[in-house]
């Protein structure tokens, strides 16, 4: 199929001191009250080019160390620390280092195969930056594509995206990236989170080959797609379309949207069950969490215990417990999904955003956007273990089980990296 045609797009990959640089476009927009400035007219994307390091000076990441490494810590590109039998809720977060870079404006951060770290940098940088476990840039993937190359236009149509969220396929071969909106002559110059259905154009998700760091697939979605998740069996991709008031369900093999499920105002978070048959989706504007059948594309039920403005959700490995950040309640909720009852709740900070669950599920990590803090919660009783002031606007978070490192995306242009250490190592 033409829309699954592999096409080399502009990628900046570092080999020693050499770079291959990509062109990008810049245009601002707003996100869930995170707006920085008034949207401007979008720049029409130009054709992709390849430039050598001699022609364009490289911009390098600046890594600032904070704490000395523990004796057991390595990057996840090699063997991780040994299993010492210490539960995550018996450890404490220690800040290791922070990373800044001229191309970094992270809305989200995701851990990939081999300890690679992916940051989605929206329309402010028009790229996905790839880091290794020590915060060095491995690649820069430009978000510009020609839709004709993917069978989505009869004529050449250069567009740029706005990478907002990402999900790694279970086999580790691909990264799926949602684009908040598209930029080009045929698109309006702005979009915002205070939308009604039909206010903005539909968008696309990209599939990226993680061996070549290439965009090798482009699939239509609804308007302003945000969070997305691949089913454990790898067959389906579920995308929450914020301004479409629905979710797209995509066949990952054929790269086609097989259908949409209408949910209501501002769907946001997604958590798919372990058998890949169903997905929980937060409907932030309707103050609801819906359960969707991924084969029939219907709503099975809604959780009454969802609370106000549920944003991000993570599901326990046994599918019994759902953790939800409730944005305007400043809390995290623990829900028994079978009984639809609230097990516990904890206030972590102002405007709770993204969540990450430790591999032993004994701890939950939370970013609090307006407070500029990161919280660690004990899941057995939903008590607060730590709150760490990181400043800025922490918005994305990811936990690397192999290294016990926690990566925090600061929307002001940083990554902050912690290690969850046994108390004796601190």
Predicted region positions:
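N-terminal acidic, proline/glycine-rich, low-complexity intrinsically disordered segments
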Residues: 2-4, 26-32
């Amino acid at each position: 199929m033409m829309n699954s045609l592999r096409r080399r797009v502009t990628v900046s990959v570092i080999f020693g001191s050499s770079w291959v640089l990509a062109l990008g476009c810049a245009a601002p927009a707003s996100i869930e009250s995170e707006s920085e400035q008034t949207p401007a007219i979008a720049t029409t994307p130009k054709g992709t080019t390849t430039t050598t390091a001699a022609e364009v000076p490289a911009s390098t990441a600046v890594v600032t160390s904070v704490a000395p490494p523990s004796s057991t810590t390595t990057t996840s590109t090699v063997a991780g620390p040994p299993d010492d039998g210490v539960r995550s809720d018996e450890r404490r977060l220690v800040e290791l280092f922070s990373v800044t870079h001229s191309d970094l404006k992270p809305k989200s951060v995701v851990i990939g195969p081999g300890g690679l770290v992916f940051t989605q940098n929206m329309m402010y940088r028009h790229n996905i930056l790839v880091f290794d476990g020590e915060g060095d840039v491995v690649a820069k993937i430009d978000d510009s594509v020609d839709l004709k190359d993917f069978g989505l236009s009869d004529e050449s149509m250069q567009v740029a995206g706005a990478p907002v969220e990402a999900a790694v396929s279970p086999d580790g071969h691909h990264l799926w990236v949602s684009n908040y909106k598209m930029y080009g002559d045929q698109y309006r110059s702005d979009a915002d989170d205070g939308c009604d259905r039909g206010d903005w154009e539909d968008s696309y998700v990209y599939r990226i080959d993680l061996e070549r760091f290439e965009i090798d697939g482009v699939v239509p979605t609804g308007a302003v797609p945000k969070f997305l998740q691949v089913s454990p069996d790898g067959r389906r991709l579920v995308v929450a379309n914020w301004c479409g008031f629905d979710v797209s369900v995509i066949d990952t093999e054929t790269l086609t949207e097989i259908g949409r499920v209408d949910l209501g105002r501002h769907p946001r978070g997604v958590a798919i069950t372990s058998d890949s048959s169903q997905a929980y989706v937060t409907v932030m504007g309707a103050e609801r969490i819906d359960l969707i059948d991924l084969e029939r594309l219907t709503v099975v039920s809604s959780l009454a215990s969802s609370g106000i403005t549920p944003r991000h959700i993570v599901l326990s490995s046994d599918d019994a417990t759902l953790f939800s950040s409730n944005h305007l309640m400043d809390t995290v909720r623990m829900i028994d999904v079978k009984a639809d009852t609230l097990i516990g709740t904890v206030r972590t900070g102002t405007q709770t955003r993204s969540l990450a669950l430790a591999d032993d599920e004994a701890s939950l990590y939370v970013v609090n956007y307006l407070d500029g803090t990161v919280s660690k919660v004990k899941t057995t009783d939903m008590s607060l273990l730590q709150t760490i002031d990181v400043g800025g606007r922490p918005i994305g978070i990811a936990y690397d089980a192999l290294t016990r490192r926690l990566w925090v995306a600061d929307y002001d242009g940083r990554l902050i990296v912690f290690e969850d250490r046994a108390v004796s190592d601190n």
